[in-house]
Amino acid sequence: ESLYVEPIVTLFGRNGGRAWKDSDERLQLMVELKSATEPTLQAVTALLGRYPEVFDPAVNPEAVRIAVTGRVPAPEDFGKYPAYVRFDGNWETDYTPGQLERIALVSVNFRTYSQWNGKGSIIPVERVKLEKIIDRAHGWGKPVRFWGAPEGTTVYYTFYDMGIDYINTDRPEVCAGFFDDFGNKNFQIGQRRTSVGGVTGTKRLDKTTRDFRGFQNDKLQLTEGIDVYTPTYRNDGGRGKVKNVIYLIGDGMGLSQIVAAFYANKGLSTLQMKYMGLQQNNALDAFTTDSAAGGSALATGERHDNRHISMSSEGEPYPSLSDFFHDKGMPVGVLTLGNVADATPTAFYGHSVERDNADELTRCLMDGRVDLLCGSGIREFTRRSDGVDLIGELEKQYDFVRSVDEIKARKGKVICIDETMDDAAEQANLTLLADATRASIAKLQEQGGKGFFLMVEGAKIDYAGHSRCLPGSIIEMLSFDLAVAEALKFADRNGETLVVVTADHETGGLVLVDGDERTGRVMGVYVSDDHTPAMLPVFAYGPGADKFCGTYMNTEIARRIKSLIK
């Protein structure tokens, strides 16, 4: 009475006759009988009968559901007790229709049918036994639970996938945490999300990206997967001339993000590349890098302090790959599916000791060392605190356009600020980065008789990690993979193009928990909403691709690219 009934009665009084003030969900109280059935149950029902407004749904439709377990009376005795008292059922009993109406749920000792310890998977012969029980309970229209079962995330997801209705747990806070925000932990192409509506976002983005509107939950789905491009492997890993370099950076893209997208789509163009390495990506002043230090290391071949953009600890600018190729008379392109003043793209054209110094970084564009810049972020050009009419200054050298579609039509150097590139990837715009990549390649090829350099960033894989949003991560990965496919297609046509794919850091500590290789269903959880120091894959294709195998610091990538340009 003091442990359960009185607190529940108090709760109902405080919440206006329901268990939760702001929810229509009903509370179920399981009462386990340890002593003799009839006298114990008579005492329990007498106590509950004093509060019909709390325990009798005939009086209050929001009343607590009572389910009696343990020493349950024989089915023929169910009628001796008030109608609001329901009972735990036995899956092997053949109940009459009237008796079945008094069954609240079906409970089974897990150990009677399986010795699974919660690791790996249930062996098939035991799973068949469990599924037979589940099917019978559901055939009655009753929920089912297994007691005496193991605990843990693998168990929770396995039971969920099997259709088990109640998770029997001694760690409710852990179990509840696992199922919290469940729609953002699961993804399958062609399937509706488990939750719709609202926005999944994060407050962990930096100054230039903090206005990102987030991932629209009702759009975090794809009706079909993307095509996977199989390269011809023309000159792959050979000693041929490297004339062009396409450098693709998946911001926040770790191995788990790649694998999740691979299983969901049943293949990736990125994983068709045969030459692979691993890069270490620690910042100079911290174990875990930010995008400034990580992107700058990829751009310059030098280690950086966090927040520094292509600039030493002492404030000396480091030349980037863009400078290297520009000085060789080769056109340079910087393309991002995000803000052009964010850390990774600015590492390829700007210099600053503070990544948030957007005014200082974008002023570097006036040096004219980039032939093509494409991304979002018009406010960085129009809402300035330095008083510079940056668009006016840049128009002395560049065509300043507002749509990716306009890039190819312009003859000279182009800055394209297309605000649609600030949106999260979804079905309607999934090919946007790939389209921009194709247009950028065509533009630079027209200008570059000696060859060209193009950096392409998939920016929002990082945003999805900060938001702990697996559907967002997979869809952004597929958007990025389409851009990789465009680079590989051009490399096959051209024969003198090196393609390098990597990341600046991993975001979120994504761990894949379960999935289904046949259907493409993937389930994963994030251990953080920040960057992690995980080593990152490097993929290479084309002449010189074999130079990117092995394990090395991220600074080696830019150095090896430069070593291949004669």
Q: Where are these predicted regions, by residue range?
A:
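Catalytic cores of phosphodiester-bond hydrolases, prominently lipid phosphodiesterases
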Residues: 2-191
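Loop/turn elements at helix/coil->beta-strand transitions in domains of secreted/extracellular proteins
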Residues: 25-28, 60-65, 138-145, 162-164, ...
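A Trp-anchored, charged/polar loop motif used as the substrate-binding/catalytic surface
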Residues: 7-15, 87-91, 399-401, 429-446
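Second-shell loop/turn segments in exported
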Residues: 28-36, 118-123, 133, 146, ...
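Active-site His/acidic residue clusters
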Residues: 343-349, 422-423, 448-451, 455-483
